[in-house]
């Protein structure tokens, strides 16, 4: 089933744990994912792995405790995909 086909999904805390599992599931269902995480290294590694497998993903640094980071996440997502269809807040602050 491709419930997320051509949907742009922004996931915070996306590079490990539940966020990573959610990222993988949405990609497997055709979603385009912005991997937003405070660990740039893990986010980049996951994005590279998924892109190598053919997924349409991007990664960006994100910290829920920094207002500027929140603004930059939205700007980044809009610049890359021109829209956000789904936002999954998977991080605490």
Predicted regions and their residues:
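A glycine-rich helix->loop->beta "capping" turn
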Residues: 5, 53-56, 76-89
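Conserved glycine-rich cofactor-binding loop
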Residues: 8, 15-16
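NAD(P)H-binding Rossmann-fold N-terminus in SDR/SDR-like oxidoreductases
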Residues: 17, 21
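Conserved glycine-rich Rossmann-like NAD(P)H-binding loop of the short-chain dehydrogenase/reductase
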Residues: 29-46
């Amino acid at each position: 089933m491709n419930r997320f086909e051509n949907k742009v999904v922004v996931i915070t805390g996306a590079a490990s744990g539940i966020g990573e599992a959610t990222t993988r599931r949405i990609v497997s269902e055709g979603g385009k994912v912005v991997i937003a995480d405070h660990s740039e290294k893990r986010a980049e590694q996951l994005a590279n792995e998924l892109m190598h497998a053919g997924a349409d993903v991007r990664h960006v640094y994100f910290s829920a405790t920094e207002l500027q980071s929140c603004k930059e996440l939205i700007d980044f997502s809009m610049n890359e995909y021109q829209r956000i269809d789904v936002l999954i807040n998977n991080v605490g602050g």
